[in-house]
């Protein structure tokens, strides 16, 4: 008998569009002989609909205008339902949820908390680790405690923020160029590069427009971005290393999803010894942050091959250009087999 799998997509997040494309790819590639797929879309302004239309409309974001395919619905927080609740009281039982949601309100523990209440097995990290991993500052603090190397940094909160004092602190602790980042935004949203004091001040403005907490890091000279995909629960495995050459000043949202100027190398152009070191570091980070299901762990590698942990993504992208499925593909997982493994892991973790 087929299991009913609910794919969540969209969301009130700056990464709404990426989520819609990722979910469309998952829906197209999931094994229909094993799973009955239901699509639950969340609009950018937070409305929830069961969606029965085509995936192309998800990709071009027009799904929200296809009223004939939209039925208001929510995930019931009641374990007696374990499914989707329609306005008329009808309950659609769900065996597993794949929250293909990126960024705030989807990847930060909020949705995971609802799913935990519902009693439905779901793909990915639990509420705690999702929340921790979303916060770049908290992640760095925890990883530093276990000896993971991180880029020199400082952080600030919007409440009581004094830009002059912040600039002075950054210039004392760090060096230009600096990168100014919202602590709780994904896909490089709101990140700016500051080569001087004026750009640092502007960077604070941009970052605080996206979050209440801001992280500032020293830029790493001639840095290469190395990524490792993690798959599994207690027996999690690390993929081969992948490398990103941005083709721009840095790997921002525009480079990732719009301009298509980045180059990707899988496996990365590094020695086997260095690859093993990075993969072991990714495994340590995954365990330290109590992750499960999947994550993508991102590093910087400087011109002397010194390694720095950058960040971790608990629901990485599943678009055609996303690194996570590409990295797992090099480990022998087709896109369809990867989805199946993720769902199996979700149900296993629930047992």
Predicted regions and their residues:
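Hydrophobic beta-strand scaffold residues
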Residues: 37, 121-122, 150, 178, ...
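Conserved metal-phosphate-binding beta-hairpin within the catalytic cores
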Residues: 218-220, 228-230, 286-318, 328
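Glycine-rich phosphate/pyrophosphate-binding beta-alpha loops
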Residues: 102-103, 188, 244-247, 313-327
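Phosphate-binding site of ATP-dependent enzymes
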Residues: 195-280, 301-308
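Active-site nucleotide/adenylate-binding loops and adjacent lid/helix of ATP-dependent enzymes
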Residues: 2-9, 13-14, 20-24, 28, ...
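ATP-binding N-terminal substructure of ATP-dependent carboxylate-amine bond-forming enzymes
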Residues: 1-128, 132-134, 138, 157-166, ...
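Active-site "cap" helix and flanking loop/linker of ATP-utilizing ligase/carboxylase catalytic domains
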Residues: 243-295, 326-351
């Amino acid at each position: 008998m087929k299991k009913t799998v609910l794919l969540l997509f969209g969301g009130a997040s700056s990464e709404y569009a990426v989520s819609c494309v990722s979910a469309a790819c998952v829906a197209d590639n999931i094994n229909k002989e094993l799973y009955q797929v239901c699509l639950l879309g969340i609009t950018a302004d937070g409305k929830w609909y069961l969606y029965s239309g085509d995936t192309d409309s998800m990709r071009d974001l027009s799904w929200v205008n296809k009223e004939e395919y939209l039925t208001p619905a929510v995930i019931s927080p009641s374990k007696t339902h374990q499914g989707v609740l329609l306005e008329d009281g009808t309950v659609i039982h769900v065996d597993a949820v794949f929250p293909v949601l990126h960024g705030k309100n989807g990847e930060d523990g909020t949705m995971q908390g609802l799913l935990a209440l519902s009693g439905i097995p779901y793909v990915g990290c639990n509420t705690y680790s999702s929340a921790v991993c979303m916060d770049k500052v908290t992640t760095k603090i925890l990883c530093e405690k276990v000896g993971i190397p991180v880029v020199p940094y400082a952080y600030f909160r919007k409440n009581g923020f004094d830009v002059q004092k912040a600039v002075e602190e950054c210039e004392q602790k760090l060096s230009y160029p600096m990168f100014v980042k919202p602590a709780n935004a994904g896909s490089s949203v709101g990140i700016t590069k500051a080569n001087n004091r004026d750009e640092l001040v502007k960077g604070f403005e941009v970052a605080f427009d996206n979050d209440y907490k801001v992280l500032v890091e020293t830029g790493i000279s001639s840095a290469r971005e190395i990524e490792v995909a993690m798959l599994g629960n207690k027996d999690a495995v690390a993929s081969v290393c992948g490398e990103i050459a941005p083709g721009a000043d840095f790997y921002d949202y525009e480079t990732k999803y719009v301009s298509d100027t980045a180059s990707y190398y899988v496996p990365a152009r590094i020695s086997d010894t260095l690859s093993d070191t990075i993969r072991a570091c990714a495994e340590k980070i995954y365990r330290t942050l109590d992750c499960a299901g999947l994550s993508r762990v991102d590093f910087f590698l400087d011109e002397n091959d010194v390694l720095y942990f950058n960040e971790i993504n608990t629901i990485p992208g599943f678009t055609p250009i996303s690194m996570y499925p590409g990295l797992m593909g090099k480990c022998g997982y087709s896109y369809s087999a990867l989805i199946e493994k993720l769902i199996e892991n979700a149900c296993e973790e629930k047992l």
